[in-house]
């Protein structure tokens, strides 16, 4: 409503203008926010409508660094590089993202997935000869991550991550194929941990350690150290322990600054169904041994369960695999490449199955039989496991004497009928081994702990050891069944007349 007073009209109009200006500012702000939201939605819509990006492997520059050779979708292509891409980041083997026009628009990381292959040999021009799990060999290029800014190049035997279609290897997988079959750490077993095998320890000390500790004397007498040692005998009697103790002793003798190595080859895991794979793995093991033996460092290659790999050729006991595996080992032992500072130690409880060519002088020169422990040796083994710091209910000497007397008592187990008509009684004592004694002591300790918890008495007692011996005799898995009577003679380590029949007698338990 207009008034006659001009001043009031002016004030009213100014208020109206101010309100309209404020409303207009709010509308402008809302319009701007709507436009921004619409722009975001439009961008999202465009992103959703955009074609999918593809990825490829950058191989090399071409055309004066203006184009790139890229392997993508199973095809080798030459593509343009977007100006937004930093060309310094484009290194061989890196993953790149391709735009709608098949243009390199983004540099990604080096590929982290692919197939595994073993490097056989390094070639010129950053290439390598690889072998896959089927035994097929091919040549691939090594990505920049393997050749640029690294302390050392990949070596033969390394496991590589490869893309066989692109023809590139991207990464060294830390676990080499040799390390999957072997353990290079020096064991912590010492001669003091082995009981009842003093004569065998002395023999292997003379055969293995003297050449490394007295090299000047060996050269003066023009005497070459043995290439290998065979430890054979019944199972569970300390063959593997001796080999580990030798490696530990060598490490102690030569000092911390020049360590020794113990390559423990897991025999059955060497076997492979593909032709030539087992032989190739043996070559890799000896290549690794020669590499470690540089600069005079002693290396022990220990083959456990040796008969599983190197059986007599033409025996018909297994497949024809041994006809090529045995010659491969003989080649490594007698080959042109020297095995200096490398000692082969083999362990087996079936020495009759090993090919004689491996056992002849000049190969496995020293053969040491590891016998089952007698009463005195058994006392020594018990003493290794019943140490002074272990709680006992009576003197340790008394415990050991009572246990040994019970273990070696006249307790018949089986009657063997030989082919000449004679018979032989085997007692439980004929099956005693160091591993069995260790298990007996562990059983006794467990019984002592249970008695201590029950509040009866504290410490290992003779009754615990005797109960453990009885339980071990009853449950021992060392004894074969009677379906093959000759197994009884083999398991106790006797060789003579063939067994025609075995009759279980049982015994006092």
Swiss-Prot record:
Keyword ATP-binding: yes
UniProt keyword annotations, A-Z: ATP-binding, Coiled coil, Nucleotide-binding
Keyword Repeat: no
GO CC, any one term: proteasome complex
Any one Pfam family match given in the protein's UniProt record, by short name: Prot_ATP_ID_OB_C
Residue numbers binding ATP: 236-241
PROSITE patterns registered for this protein in UniProt: AAA
PANTHER family: AAA-FAMILY ATPASE, PROTEASOME-ASSOCIATED ATPASE
Quaternary structure, from the entry: Homohexamer. Assembles into a hexameric ring structure.
Annotated family: Belongs to the AAA ATPase family.
This protein's name: AAA ATPase forming ring-shaped complexes
């Amino acid at each position: 409503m207009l008034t006659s007073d001009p001043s009031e009209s002016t004030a009213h109009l100014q208020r109206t203008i101010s309100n309209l200006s404020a409303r207009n500012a709010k509308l402008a702000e809302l319009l701007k926010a709507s436009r921004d939201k619409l722009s975001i939605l439009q961008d999202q819509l465009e992103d959703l409508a955009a074609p999918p990006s593809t990825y490829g492997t950058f191989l090399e520059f071409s055309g004066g660094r203006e184009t790139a050779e890229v392997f993508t979708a199973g095809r080798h292509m030459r593509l343009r590089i977007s100006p937004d891409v930093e060309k310094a980041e484009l290194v061989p083997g890196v993953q790149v993202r391709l735009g709608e026009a098949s243009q390199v628009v983004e540099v990604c990381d080096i590929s982290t997935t692919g197939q595994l292959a073993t490097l056989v040999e390094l070639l010129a021009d950053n290439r390598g000869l690889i072998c896959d799990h089927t035994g097929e060999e091919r040549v691939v290029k090594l990505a920049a991550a393997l050749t640029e800014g690294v302390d050392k190049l990949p070596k033969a035997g390394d496991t590589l991550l490869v893309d066989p279609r692109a023809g590139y290897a991207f990464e060294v997988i830390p676990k080499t194929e040799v390390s999957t079959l072997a353990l290079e750490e020096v064991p912590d077993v010492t001669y003091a941990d082995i009981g009842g095998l003093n004569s065998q320890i002395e023999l292997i000390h003379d055969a293995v350690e003297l050449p490394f500790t007295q090299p000047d004397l060996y050269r003066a007498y023009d005497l070459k150290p043995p290439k290998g040692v065979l430890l054979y005998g019944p199972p569970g009697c300390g063959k593997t322990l001796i080999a580990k103790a030798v490696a530990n002793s060598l490490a102690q003798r030569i000092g911390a600054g020049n360590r020794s190595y113990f390559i423990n080859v897991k025999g059955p895991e060497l076997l492979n169904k593909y032709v030539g794979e087992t032989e190739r793995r043996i070559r890799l093991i000896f290549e690794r041994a020669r590499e470690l033996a540089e600069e005079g460092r002693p290396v022990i290659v220990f083959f456990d369960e040796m008969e599983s790999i190197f059986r007599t050729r033409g025996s018909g006991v297994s497949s024809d695999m041994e006809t090529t595996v045995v010659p491969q080992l003989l080649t490594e032992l007698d080959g042109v490449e020297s095995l200096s500072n490398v000692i082969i130690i083999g362990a087996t409880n079936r020495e009759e199955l090993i090919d004689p060519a491996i056992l002849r002088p000049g190969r496995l020169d020293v053969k040491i039989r590891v016998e089952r422990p007698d009463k005195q040796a058994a006392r020594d083994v018990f003493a290794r496991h019943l140490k002074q710091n272990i709680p006992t209910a009576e003197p340790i000497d008394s415990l050991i004497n009572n246990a040994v007397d019970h273990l070696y008592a006249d307790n018949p187990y089986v009657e063997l009928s030989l082919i000449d008509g004679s018979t032989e009684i085997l007692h439980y004592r004929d099956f005693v081994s160091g591993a069995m004694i260790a298990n007996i002591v562990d059983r006794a300790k467990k019984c002592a702990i249970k008695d201590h918890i029950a509040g009866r008495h504290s410490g290992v007692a003779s009754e615990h050891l005797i109960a453990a011996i009885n339980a071990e005799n009853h449950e021992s898995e060392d004894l074969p069944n009677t379906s093959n009577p000759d197994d009884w003679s083999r398991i106790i380590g006797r060789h003579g007349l063939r067994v025609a029949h075995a009759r279980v007698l049982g015994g006092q338990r």
